[in-house]
Design a protein with these regions (language model features):
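FAD-site-proximal beta/loop scaffold in flavoenzymes
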Residues: 3-11, 16-97, 189, 193, ...
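A short alpha-helix capping/helix-coil boundary motif
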Residues: 10-12, 16-19, 106-110, 167-169
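A broad, structural micro-motif
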Residues: 18, 125-127
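Flexible, glycine-rich terminal cap/loop adjacent to redox cofactors
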Residues: 27, 118-125, 134-220
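A short alpha-helix-loop-beta-strand transition element characteristic
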Residues: 42-46, 102-112, 138-142
Length: 220
């Protein structure tokens, strides 16, 4: 809600008002499953269409992919909705393989995503704190604020990175990063590490490409 077209103030449910220079509406999406319901397909607890690991629905002659499909989260193991272009694209290719008689599986989604906000890049992968709490999974968090490449090399810019991990096993559970440069590279590395089940100590031992314009010898 705003006082004019520039959205100069946000009005909360309790009536309090917060002045704002910019308001970003990020409401998410809701799966459109009316056609699936009319066809008698099973709908999952999240409201998405239930599919097996081959993306086949409860009707063996129908496959389903994309934003309206319920998937298993790769970290929590729980059913969830992750309406994202990357997984949807991969699901489409996997479903096509299965339709053509080449059995291929889609095991889980890890929610790896990225977007640009003006000059900043924000990215994330794995589970966030809310998801881990809902799943009853213990976690610890570490925040680091390194430069995107060697600080002595011209043009270095700060990045903020948050990593969630199991405090007992050290297994990486989720990560977020934001910065003008370098957030995409770090999240892709962490997404790979999370999907591989690596611990924070194993991640620290990864050998990554290094040169002063691209990173640090001790990369975050």
């Amino acid at each position: 809600a705003g006082e004019d077209a520039l959205a100069s103030v946000v009005v909360l449910k309790d009536g309090s008002r917060i002045p704002a220079d910019l308001v970003v509406l990020a409401m998410g999406v809701r799966p459109e499953t009316s056609l699936a319901r009319e066809a008698g397909l099973d709908i999952g607890s999240t409201g998405g269409i239930k599919v097996d690991e081959h993306l086949r629905t409860s009707d063996p002659s129908i496959w389903a992919v994309g934003d309206a499909v319920e998937v298993i989260h790769g970290v929590t193991g729980q059913p969830c909705l992750l309406p994202m272009a990357g997984p949807a694209n991969r699901q489409g290719r996997i479903a096509a393989e299965n339709v053509l008689g080449r059995p291929t599986t889609y095991k889980a989604s890890f929610g790896t995503g990225i977007l640009r906000i003006f000059r900043l890049t924000a990215a994330g992968t794995g589970a966030n704190e809310r998801m881990l709490r809902q799943a009853g999974m213990p976690f610890a968090a570490v925040h680091v604020h390194p430069m995107d490449h060697a600080s002595y090399y011209a043009g270095a810019m700060p990045i903020s990175i948050k990593l969630l991990f199991d405090p007992t096993t050290g297994r990486a559970l989720g990560a977020q990063a934001i910065g003008q440069r370098g957030a995409d590279k770090r999240i892709d590395v962490l997404a790979t590490a999370i999907q591989a089940g690596l611990t924070v100590r194993q991640i620290a031992q990864l050998e990554l490409g290094y040169a002063p314009p691209y990173g640090s010898a001790k990369d975050p």
